[in-house]
């Protein structure tokens, strides 16, 4: 017990003392031909501590891809790792030979070039490995990115859509770091939150309507999203794209892999600080991230040691400027 408690303190203490960091906004790629290089990298999530990572066209995570509906796109995916992986286009309606599942291995040093027509409506999708038995490890180490599809209907709507100004991707993930600051997998002690690969992030937002594209990129944690001032926000899209009418809510639950687009109105809040939170205390038992998953703690090692489970916690700080 003492050993486990010491390990937990070691995991949490860097997070407690870690200073706030500006939210990283992934780079973008657009057009009809995309070159994606899967590679190793190194990131200092904690000052002076190098953490080995995986990334696409960078050290961690992947660029945001912009597709236009009905375009035919070619994606040249090169695997620079020393072991096989795959890339799956999560949520896209594409032929099975281009899906990127476990049956479509990209061997080390090789390039896979799927080519398909973009059939989905405007919305937020994502891409990540889907190898047999390796999906969790590869995603946890950093292989994940957003896909934004645009179409003629969405472009006519009065919505924020200036990327990185009033339209932000938020890849929300929980992670475990061991005492050597290395990313650990296959554990339920995921007590460190990241948004776009940033620990303890803040974002300066304009005093207006702002669009957020939420992706629950965690392995098995469900979030009950809400704002710290408990104000209403508006859901405008789900996994499948835009919904018919904005849905006014003050809570939004997303399971792993799910996406949603929301609009938050920061008008009249100049100078204020508001947090995007998860109200996990409100999750029903049986849901991953709740107090009790009702599966027997023996089947989920360390689940009941995780301080986030069943707790309300901050995810991202908004500073209205």
Question: Which positions does each model-derived feature cover?
Answer:
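Beta-strand-rich extracellular modules
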Residues: 78-80, 130-134, 267, 279-281
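Low-complexity, Pro/Ser/Thr- and charge-rich linker/hinge segments at domain boundaries
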Residues: 26-28, 150-168, 305-310, 321
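Hydrophobic or amphipathic alpha-helical targeting/insertion segments
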Residues: 114-158
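Short, flexible loop/turn segments at beta-strand junctions in immunoglobulin-like
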Residues: 66, 116-120, 264-266
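Histidine- and aromatic-rich segments of cupredoxin/plastocyanin-like copper-binding domains
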Residues: 96-106, 172, 179-321
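Bacterial Sec-dependent N-terminal signal peptides
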Residues: 1-20
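N-terminal, post-signal-peptide metal-ligating segments of extracellular/periplasmic oxidoreductases
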Residues: 19-97, 101-113, 165, 181-212, ...
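Short, hydrophobic/aromatic beta-strand segments
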Residues: 47, 83-90, 141, 221-228, ...
């Amino acid at each position: 017990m003492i050993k486990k408690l010491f390990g937990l303190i070691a995991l949490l203490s860097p997070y407690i003392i870690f200073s706030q960091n500006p939210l990283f906004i992934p780079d973008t790629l657009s057009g009809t031909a995309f070159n994606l290089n899967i590679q190793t990298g190194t990131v200092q999530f904690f000052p002076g501590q190098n953490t080995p990572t995986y990334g696409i066209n960078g050290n961690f995570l992947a660029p945001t891809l912009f597709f236009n509906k009905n375009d035919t796109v070619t994606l040249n995916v090169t695997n620079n790792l020393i072991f096989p992986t795959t890339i799956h286009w999560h949520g896209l309606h594409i032929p099975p030979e281009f899906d990127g599942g476990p049956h479509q291995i990209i061997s080390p040093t090789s390039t896979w070039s799927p080519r398909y027509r973009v059939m989905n409506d405007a919305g937020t999708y994502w891409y990540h490995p889907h190898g047999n038995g390796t999906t969790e490890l590869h995603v946890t180490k950093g292989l994940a990115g957003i896909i934004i599809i645009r179409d003629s209907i969405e472009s006519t709507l009065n919505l924020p859509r200036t990327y990185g100004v009033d339209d932000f991707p938020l890849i929300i993930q929980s992670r475990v770091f061991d005492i050597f600051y290395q990313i650990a997998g296959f554990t339920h002690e995921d007590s460190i939150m990241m948004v776009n690969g940033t620990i303890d992030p803040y974002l300066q937002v304009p005093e207006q309507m702002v669009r957020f594209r939420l992706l629950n990129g965690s392995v098995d944690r469900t979030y009950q999203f809400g704002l710290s001032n408990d104000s209403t926000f508006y859901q405008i899209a789900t996994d499948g794209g835009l919904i018919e009418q904005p849905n006014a809510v003050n809570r939004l639950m997303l399971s792993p892999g799910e996406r949603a687009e929301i609009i938050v109105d920061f008008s009249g809040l100049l100078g204020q600080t508001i947090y995007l939170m998860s109200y996990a205390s409100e999750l029903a038992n049986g849901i991953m991230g709740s107090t009790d998953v009702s599966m027997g703690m023996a089947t989920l090692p360390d689940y009941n040691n995780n301080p986030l489970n069943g707790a309300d916690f901050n995810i991202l700080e908004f500073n209205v400027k």
